[in-house]
């Protein structure tokens, strides 16, 4: 039971109990555990000593006296946004973005080569916490347009089998297709898979043999599992401004792809390498 598990956690060697579901209830369980001898006085003192030692090492007692334990937001932003840190972010993006596989002669992209672009934006819904950065698709679309590309956002049409728009409406209109996938795992969602739009998987990449297609994942590096036939695939691993700017530089040939796969983006599947 939780009543026993709470004190047994400390007795087993954990010094601090975090992420309590109900602090009053868990406090009472802890107190009863001490009274019942589940947590011995020796173990209690050991845990408290370690906790206080950590706080002392962090000088929290001094910061509490000065009122600086929680920094003022303005001061924090001054530290977080200094040029040295921004330079680190740019360097990290430049060195990490990975061209996982490439169809010959698709890259680099330029407005002269691909004037009209069809843009597919696949992203998670906003939630409470641990969620993806919202609006990445809008940001990247504007970046493409700023370079001179004409970009249309894909919107699924209403219809059903036999009544959808003709294939040639896309293949005869667009010079390039770009998928930007912004899906991210979080604490209680350990698997992320692409869920295709209705009707009938309207945004599935089916024009790859007719229109050059580039797929970009800005978070999860394993999406080839769901789109193995995509011939040009890029992982950026993050969606901040520095990553998006570096991505565009590399797509347009102004910077080389330097990243080396830190994981297996092919997911041990033979068809993802085709």
Model-derived features with residue positions:
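Preference for extracellular/luminal or secreted protein segments
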Residues: 2-274
């Amino acid at each position: 039971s939780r009543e026993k598990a709470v004190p047994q956690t400390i007795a087993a060697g954990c010094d601090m109990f975090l992420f309590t579901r109900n602090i009053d209830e868990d406090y009472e369980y802890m107190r009863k555990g001490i009274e019942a001898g589940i947590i011995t006085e020796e173990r209690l003192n050991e845990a408290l000593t370690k906790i206080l030692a950590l706080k002392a090492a962090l000088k929290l007692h001094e910061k509490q006296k000065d009122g600086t334990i929680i920094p003022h937001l303005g001061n924090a932003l001054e530290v977080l946004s200094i040029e040295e840190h921004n330079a680190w972010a740019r360097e990290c993006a430049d060195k990490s973005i990975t061209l996982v596989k490439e169809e010959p002669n698709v890259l680099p992209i330029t407005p002269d080569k691909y004037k009209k672009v069809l843009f597919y934006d696949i992203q998670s819904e906003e939630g409470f916490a641990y969620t993806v950065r919202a609006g990445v698709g809008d940001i990247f679309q504007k970046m493409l347009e700023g370079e001179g590309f004409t970009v249309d956002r894909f919107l699924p049409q209403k219809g059903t089998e036999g009544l959808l728009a003709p294939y040639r409406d896309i293949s005869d209109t667009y010079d390039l297709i770009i998928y930007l996938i912004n899906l991210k795992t979080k604490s209680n969602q350990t698997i992320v898979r692409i869920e295709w739009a209705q009707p009938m998987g309207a945004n599935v990449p089916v024009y790859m043999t007719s229109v050059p297609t580039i797929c970009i994942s800005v978070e999860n590096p394993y999406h080839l599992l769901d789109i193995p036939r995509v011939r040009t695939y890029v992982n950026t691993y993050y969606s901040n401004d520095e990553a998006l700017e570096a991505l565009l530089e590399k797509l347009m040939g102004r910077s080389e792809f330097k990243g080396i796969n830190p994981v297996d983006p092919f997911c041990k599947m033979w068809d993802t390498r085709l």
